[in-house]
Amino acid sequence: KEGYPVDWGNCKYECMSDAYCKDLCVDRKAKSGYCYKLNWSCYCEGLPDDSPIKTNGHCRPGGRRK
């Protein structure tokens, strides 16, 4: 699947470089990833079906963990 990976607080990962997002996505078993610069967030392609991605829920910043 594709989407914005989220941390424990349901927050997207902010980015400025494609390399950061590629590493983050590959760590989550995705095929690839990049920094979507229109909203400065990592976007992953080829994630496993059970990987959490951003949905309509609110971001709870206290939950940031890698």
Swiss-Prot record:
Source taxon at top rank: Eukaryota
Main localization (coarse): secreted
Gene Ontology molecular functions: sodium channel inhibitor activity; toxin activity
GO biological process terms held by the UniProt record: defense response
Organs and tissues of expression: Expressed by the venom gland.
Disulphides: C11-C59, C15-C35, C21-C42, C25-C44
Cellular localisation: Secreted
Gene3D superfamilies xref list: Knottin, scorpion toxin-like
InterPro entries: LCN-type_CS_alpha_beta_dom, Scorpion_toxin-like, Scorpion_toxin-like_sf, Scorpion_toxinL, Scorpion_toxinL/defensin
Alphabetical UniProt keywords: Disulfide bond, Ion channel impairing toxin, Neurotoxin, Secreted, Toxin, Voltage-gated sodium channel impairing toxin
Example of a GO cellular component annotation carried by this entry: extracellular region
Stretches assigned to the LCN-type CS-alpha/beta domain: 1-60
Entry-linked SUPFAM superfamilies: Scorpion toxin-like
SMART domains: Knot1
Keyword Plastid: no
Biological function: Alpha toxins bind voltage-independently at site-3 of sodium channels (Nav) and inhibits the inactivation of the activated channels, thereby blocking neuronal transmission.
Recorded domain comment: Has the structural arrangement of an alpha-helix connected to antiparallel beta-sheets by disulfide bonds (CS-alpha/beta).
Family under the similarity heading: Belongs to the long (4 C-C) scorpion toxin superfamily. Sodium channel inhibitor family. Alpha subfamily.
Protein name: Putative alpha-neurotoxin RjAa13
